[in-house]
């Protein structure tokens, strides 16, 4: 059982070891010369790279399919505009949370669960997100991308 304080890095994993994860919130912006859809696809494709996520086994999601998350994020933006008549005023297209763990302190599967719980706390269950756990470096780390 993993216990976490509100949007923090300290948690208690099931082995009874206290751990601190480096966590960073990043606003994702549209790149010049690219559409919002192309930027979202690029970001979600990078996060879900099969070479970094054990062939996709370390990807989880909430209220969207990992296979179509970028398209679903775009649909959500369009629905917001239609329902409210308002467009987003800033150029933030999504948010990413990156979470890194010290080498050897957590398994990839545990890291994905911790990332999912953190993304759920951040979104309060109101927004779709994906969590992709990367194992391509010495330290295991998560990329969590959420629409808003």
Predicted features and spans:
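N-terminal nicking endonuclease/strand-transfer module with a His-rich metal-binding environment
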Residues: 2-148
